[in-house]
Amino acid sequence: MKNDDIAILVLSIQRKGANKTVRYLERNNFDDYTVMIPSGLDDEIAESYGDHAFVYDVDEMKKKVDFMGTDIQNGASVGRMACNDWIRTRPDYKMAVVLDDDYGGVVSDYTTVPTLNNRTFYEIVKAVYKLGKDLGIITGGYSGGAHPDTKKNIMNVWLIDKDIEDRGLNKILNEDVCYSIMCWHRGKANFGLGNVLRSGAQTAEMEKLDGNTKMIYQTDRSYRKSFGSVLADPRNAKLAYNSGNIKRGALWHHKINWADICPKIILEG
């Protein structure tokens, strides 16, 4: 696969000047990118990106998204569905990297991989994509739920292609985790791209502990909350709540039994 076969898609509802990911893309000479913008916003937002903008029909995408009986219509899940449709109708591309508009660390010169640049970014993406295809892994990662009552957002890094199933990309908040656990039970791992591409600047997140209390803990959002981190060290799973331990690893929305979620590709490979 050549670099030209890979599209870069950025989910955004902001004008260009406020889009951190686009700022870093342009700073590091990533000229070929598309900003996925939901319909119903001010025309000025799409206009600020010029030819890089693609406005998708929110209502059409929502028809395809399964919200598991909830009323939470998460913008990220709808946006990812739009990316699914986009890549399927683009014969010039074989796959796409989907980024959140505040995930500039992946393509910036401030990442935890200081040598990351245009060339190495594509090489890493291609290597992880090939690994996922060879092993039947859904390649993607998210960090979300920090402010579920106000933002209802998910931070995205996903690798998608024309073969990806809609249902695999339309989960929201806890349901992302539920979907991942379901896949692991069936022998398919959900691997966080944040394991190899992550921003050291994402060091604080808030977890709602009860109706009124929130606590800030230090973590690398995309890695420490990914299944890859649990795969690397089972102790990263949230086995029990410990209010005195602010470095207790990945804070899942469910208690996890490591033996139950070990993927069959590890146990039987």
What are these regions (language model features)?
Residues G104-H185:
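Conserved catalytic core of nucleotide-sugar-dependent glycosyltransferases
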